[in-house]
Amino acid sequence: MATKQEEQANLSDVLTPSMSLTELEMKFADETDGKAKDVVQARIKKAEDGILPLRLQFNDFTQIMSSLDEERYANVSKQEKFQMIRSKVLGLTERLQELSNDFEELQPLFATVGEYSKTYKNKNFQVLENLASYNHRGKAGASISNSTPTPAAATPTTAPTPGAGTKKAAKTAPTPTATATIGTPSNNAPTPATTATTPGTQAKKPRKPRQTKKQQQAAAAAAAVAQAQAQAQAQAQNQNQNNMQNKNISNPGMNSNMGTPVMGNPNMKQMQSPIPANAMNNMNVPHNGAMRPSVPNGNMGNPSMGNLNMNAPNMGNPNMNNPNMNNPNAMMSPMAGQGQLNQMFPMQNHNQNGQFMGQQSPGPNIGQMQFPPNNGNMNGMPGTSDMNLGMNPSMNMNMGMNLNQITPANILSMNTKGKDDQMQNIGMDQNQNQNQSQNQSQNQNQSMNMNMNNDSNNPKSAYDLVDFNSLDLSSLNMDFL
């Protein structure tokens, strides 16, 4: 034990903390104290010899830990296993601690290796790891590690040739410090990898508008298709409406909302006078031109009540003795003035002379109602409750005929014109009735048969639009004679 303590004392005197290379050389060169070199060599030999037993002891410990479940340890109790493992661990830690103490005592010598390589330009000795962190002395170890430069670990270990090798070593000598400072945490310079990747990520952003263009094109195509479909639907709806209107015009008996056709003027095909639906549905005028009110006494009510029964207690005989009633041309003209009926369904009552019995109230001014020359008779129909106006084109209720346009030639052509239009409309009625549903076709066939029977019974009243025997030409413009 004394010898071991003496060796430690001698080694501590030789290898002092923060010792420089020159001081170590001076101690080794002192002839008076020639034991210093021998003491350092003996301690290095001891540390080197302690490495192999430590490795063998560690291998034994790992083998025992891996074979605890084998059959050879089946009869061993758990307590014995615990004690065996504990002894192996303690022996391993003791051997490791001895090796650590030997390296710690030699730490001042290892610190001079880097300085030796720089001074003598010899790289035969390069420390792979600095053991200053394992120094339990604290400040001394820290001062040693800070004072000595850290050698580069990537430098080759081959010995250079004398002569030219020294020049190459002089040129490459600063490389260890340069390589050491590049990887230190104190260097805050950004690495080139981060600067290189940033433009790469930003260069990918312009690709997004390409996708948006495709999406915009797809959306525009979809919008165009939708717009074309909407236009096609609108055109189909308009065509259907036009077809329905054409059917209604060609067959006025099918639509209760159609106006009264005008057949007196050769220059005008037909004029429509809008009449409320409830009034048109409840009115019917046969080919003989007589209006048939639903009330037996021939009274006519207010159309605002939804019914065309017009209650006129002072009318008495339905024959109306208005001077203009005997003149069908005056009734046909919208310019007849005082002799025309300005409102079809007035709100007040009439007497037999066509005079108003009360104050005129605002009512629906539907149009000028024109009666055919049938002596103004209004035949009562007690079996019905409403007035029904038939929408056959042959009915004698013509609207708005101007007397100034009537000439002898027009008077002669009115009869033939009415016959041609009547036959054309009857043919169109028959074609339209075939395209309707079964229930509507049956009803219209019945109405057509009734109209044809009336025409056959009284052909003169059906086709002769003007009765020359009852014409009053006193109000005609005779300038053309």
Swiss-Prot record:
Protein keywords: Activator, Coiled coil, Nucleus, Transcription, Transcription regulation
Signal peptide: none
One cellular component (GO) term of this entry: mediator complex
Lineage top rank: taxon: Eukaryota
Region of interest: Disordered: 140-261, 415-463
GO BP, one annotated term: regulation of transcription by RNA polymerase II
Residue ranges that the Swiss-Prot or TrEMBL entry lists as coiled coil: 79-107
UniProt biased composition (Basic residues): 204-213
GO molecular function: transcription coregulator activity
Compositional bias (Polar residues): 249-259
Subcellular location field: Nucleus
Any Pfam family hit: Med3
Function recorded in the entry: Component of the Mediator complex, a coactivator involved in regulated gene transcription of nearly all RNA polymerase II-dependent genes. Mediator functions as a bridge to convey information from gene-specific regulatory proteins to the basal RNA polymerase II transcription machinery. Mediator is recruited to promoters by direct interactions with regulatory proteins and serves as a scaffold for the assembly of a functional preinitiation complex with RNA polymerase II and the general transcription factors.
Subunit organization: Component of the Mediator complex.
UniProt record similarity statement: Belongs to the Mediator complex subunit 3 family.
Protein name per its UniProtKB record: Mediator of RNA polymerase II transcription subunit 3
